[in-house]
Structures are given as structure tokens and as C-alpha cells.
Design a protein with these regions (language model features):
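Conserved beta-loop-beta/alpha segment of the NTase-like Rossmann-fold superfamily
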Residues: 98-99, 103-203
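Residue-level preference for alpha-helix termini and adjacent loops
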Residues: 23, 36, 44-47, 169-170, ...
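Beta-sheet entry/capping signal
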Residues: 23-27, 44, 74-79, 105-107, ...
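Residues immediately flanking
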Residues: 30-31, 167, 250
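N-terminal glycine-rich phosphate-binding loop and ensuing alpha1 helix
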Residues: 1-107, 115, 125-142, 150-152, ...
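Catalytic core of tubulin tyrosine ligase-like
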Residues: 154, 158-163, 171-175, 180-290
Length: 290
């Protein structure tokens, strides 16, 4: 991290060349709904403007357009939606004329779903004839990407690196030439953008080494000791907050498909119907999502 500022120009030049050669693509994880924002629409459709309409999707596309203008090359953009928001998302992009992005470089695909269960292992019902499901988490994006035929399409187009980013952060830069160049120049097979935690209590996952291997520990998994642990210089030992902005080599992703990831179980508030068919909207966590 200390070398980035000193080598910024070199990294940017390397990354710019890779983008011009069509080796870099961006992939937006946008399967979520804006429920916590008080919206029943896809999270990316949420209007964050103060004096005019400005949408989350719009800001993300604007950020990517900055890279297009900087490098003079379009970056292939893949947008992962979910069963619950795909139609609204695609329609919104069409209505907004893709916010000025060349639609020939944009592909949508739908994330796999997983059932939701109660704490005692019973499957919830969303309706009388439909079990309750939710998107299967960020870790499932690549399987969905492959099943949609987009991995093969990307490889045929010459894509070697995919920058994964989430819909939540409108300030982030994706397909960042400096970020791309730093990974290529260092000979790394993957990379992550991080920000320093503002306080020990900040609710953000952290990037760290676990048994000598890069790992992410979610904020709710940090023990009290880990949260406040400091190094000799007084800085937090677990300070590198992840913002869900990763760069991967596409060949490595294909190789790793042979390895099954462990299921990450998360406690959530899950709306469902009870045995009498009445709608239940819990105020506290009542089950697991996977």
C-alpha cells in the first residue's frame, strides 16, 4: 500500500494499456432491493439527489464513464440482478438510455437463489405455493456468470481481469487504471481495494491474514479483542476495511470452480407466512439466509 502513491503514474500507464487492449471488465453486484432505504425497488434505482434526481446506478455509470474518457476505451460491464429485481433493473437502464453508456458493452444476468430457513431448520414459505428464497450471496456471482454464458463471452472478447464491485458505494472507482496496473505490475492474481477504518467500532468487514492466507472477517465476526487490537505504532491491527471492490484473474476463477466454497450463514429478519397463511414481518432476526 505504501508503494502505490510513489508508483501511481507507472501503475496507471500499465492499467490504461490493459483497458485499451480490452483485457479489463467490470461486474456490478446489484441483486439487492432498497428495503433498508425505504424503497420496494432495486437498490440501484434509489434517488440520492438533493436538488435534482440522481440515482445510484447513474452515479456508478458516471464513475465508470470517467475511466472510459480517461483511457479512450469502453469497459465491458456485466450487471448481476436477482429474480426479484431483474425486470425493473433492465427496464430502468433502457428508460434512462443506459445513462450514456454504450449498451453494446452491457450485459445483465440473474443471480442464483437459495432458500431461507428458521433457526430450527424449517424452510419458510413466501406464499402458500412458494418457498421463501433470497439471492445466494456475493460468493455465488461467478457460477451465475458462467451459467449465463458470459464467462465464455468475456474470454472470447479478450477479457483477462474482472473488477467486481457492489451497488452500495457511489464514491468508488471501478476498472481504476491505477488499481489494475498495480496488480498486473506486482504479478498478483487478485487484489482488493480497502479503506482505513475510522473507528474500531465501524461496521465494516476487514481484510487480514488467516493462517497466512488473505481472508475477510465480517464486522460482526470480530471479537472484542480483535476489534481494539493495535500494532506497535498504535494503528489498529485490523484496520483495512473492505468496500467490496475486487480484481480477479478470470483464469483463476475458472480453476477455483472445482473447489466448493463453504456456505456462509447469516442471521436475518425473514418475512414469511405462518401455518395459517398470515403474513409475518419480524422485527428481530428470525432465521438464516445462505
Amino acid at each position: 500500500i505504501a508503494d502505490i502513491e510513489a508508483n501511481k503514474d507507472k501503475y496507471t500507464a500499465i492499467g490504461t494499456e490493459a483497458i485499451k487492449e480490452g483485457k479489463v471488465a467490470a461486474l456490478l453486484l446489484a441483486g439487492g432491493m432498497g428495503t433498508r432505504l425505504g424503497s420496494d425497488k432495486p437498490k440501484g434505482m434509489y434517488n440520492i439527489g438533493l436538488t435534482r434526481d440522481v440515482y445510484i446506478f447513474e452515479m456508478l455509470i458516471k464513475n465508470l464513464m470517467d475511466v472510459v474518457n480517461q483511457t479512450g476505451a469502453w469497459v465491458p460491464l456485466y450487471i448481476m440482478t436477482s429474480e426479484k429485481n431483474n425486470d425493473d433493473t433492465v427496464k430502468f437502464f433502457e428508460e434512462m438510455n443506459y445513462f450514456g453508456y454504450d449498451k453494446n458493452y452491457v450485459d445483465f444476468f440473474v443471480q442464483e437463489m437459495a432458500p431461507a430457513a428458521s433457526f430450527d431448520g424449517k424452510i419458510f414459505l413466501e406464499d402458500k405455493d412458494r418457498i421463501s428464497t433470497s439471492p445466494n450471496g456475493n460468493g455465488g456471482w461467478f457460477i451465475s456468470f458462467v451459467k449465463a454464458g458470459l464467462c465464455e463471452k468475456a474470454k472470447k472478447a479478450g477479457v483477462e481481469y474482472i473488477n467486481i464491485f457492489a451497488v452500495d458505494n457511489v464514491c468508488q472507482r471501478m476498472a481504476d487504471p491505477c488499481f489494475v496496473g498495480a496488480m498486473i505490475d506486482g504479478g498478483y492474481r487478485s487484489a482488493a481495494k480497502v479503506v482505513s477504518k475510522a473507528t474500531p467500532e465501524e461496521k465494516v468487514g476487514v481484510l487480514c491474514l488467516e493462517d497466512g492466507k488473505p481472508s475477510i472477517v465480517e464486522y460482526y465476526e470480530l471479537t472484542e479483542d480483535m476489534r481494539y487490537q493495535t500494532k506497535a505504532d498504535g494503528e489498529l491491527a485490523y484496520k483495512y476495511g473492505v468496500i467490496l471492490n475486487y480484481l480477479f484473474n478470470i483464469e483463476d476463477l475458472e480453476k477455483n470452480m472445482k473447489n466448493n466454497l463453504s456456505v456462509h450463514i447469516v442471521k436475518k429478519k425473514i418475512a414469511h407466512i405462518d401455518e395459517n397463511g398470515n403474513a409475518v414481518k419480524p422485527e428481530t432476526e428470525n432465521g438464516f439466509k445462505f
